[in-house]
């Protein structure tokens, strides 16, 4: 199965056009996928005391978090689609990792190391920004991929960033969508 984690509040956005491009391609190929639309789901990214108590025991009272965990545990491919705001992913995506990627699900504590709990062989990160990709490569390629994703078993990472997403030309955005359709 393919999981798509979408982290943008507007369905009128270029990020949503990216999501539609990916899902249109998957539908055309008859591939099974599940979209996790964090904003549409009204996902609460704030970890409160109750969440923390359950997190430490590897559980949750949230049916939605359990559903997200189930989707991820069945997925071999994961897409992340999000804008880069203030140099990193939106807070809702950070909260998704904080609350969903629990011990016993996303990872296990070994004697000497963390053992990944997920078995994702292809992880596609699609971002939008106004600045050049090189500015964000230390965050995405130097931290997010090796320390956040690989640690929990999201491997085979590919990153695609649409620079000048808001100020670039329509042709620029259409070319990016065509590129995404070719790799989806």
Q: Language-model features: where?
A:
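N-terminal beta1-alpha1-beta2 submodule of the flavodoxin-like/Rossmannoid cofactor-binding fold
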Residues: 1-105, 109-110, 167-184
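Cofactor-binding loop segments of dinucleotide-utilizing enzymes, especially the Rossmann-like FAD-
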Residues: 7, 38, 127-128, 162
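Short, structurally constrained coil/turn elements
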Residues: 27-29, 119, 153
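Glycine-rich, flexible loop/turn motifs
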Residues: 51, 114, 156
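Structured loop/turn residues at beta-strand edges in well-structured enzyme cores
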Residues: 73, 91, 118-121, 155
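Short, glycine-/small-residue-rich phosphate/pyrophosphate-handling segment
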Residues: 108-151
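Glycine-rich phosphate/pyrophosphate-binding loop and the adjoining helix
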Residues: 134-135, 139-184
């Amino acid at each position: 199965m393919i999981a798509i984690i979408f982290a943008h509040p507007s369905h009128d956005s270029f990020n949503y056009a990216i999501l539609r491009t990916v899902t249109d391609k998957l539908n055309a190929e008859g591939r099974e996928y599940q979209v996790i639309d964090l904003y549409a789901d009204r996902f609460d990214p704030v970890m409160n005391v109750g969440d923390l108590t359950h997190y430490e025991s590897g559980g949750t009272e949230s049916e939605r978090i359990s559903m997200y965990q189930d989707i991820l545990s069945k997925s071999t491919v994961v897409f992340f689609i999000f804008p880069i705001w203030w140099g990193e992913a939106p807070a809702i995506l950070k909260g998704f990792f904080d609350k969903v990627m629990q011990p016993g699900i996303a990872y296990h504590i070994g004697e000497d190391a963390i053992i990944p709990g997920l078995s994702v062989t292809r992880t596609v990160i699609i971002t939008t920004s106004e600045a050049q990709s090189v500015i964000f490569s230390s965050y995405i390629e130097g931290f997010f991929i090796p320390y956040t994703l690989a640690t929990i078993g999201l491997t085979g990472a590919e990153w695609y960033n649409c620079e000048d997403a808001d100020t670039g030309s329509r042709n620029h955005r259409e070319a990016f969508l065509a590129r995404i359709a070719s790799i989806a």
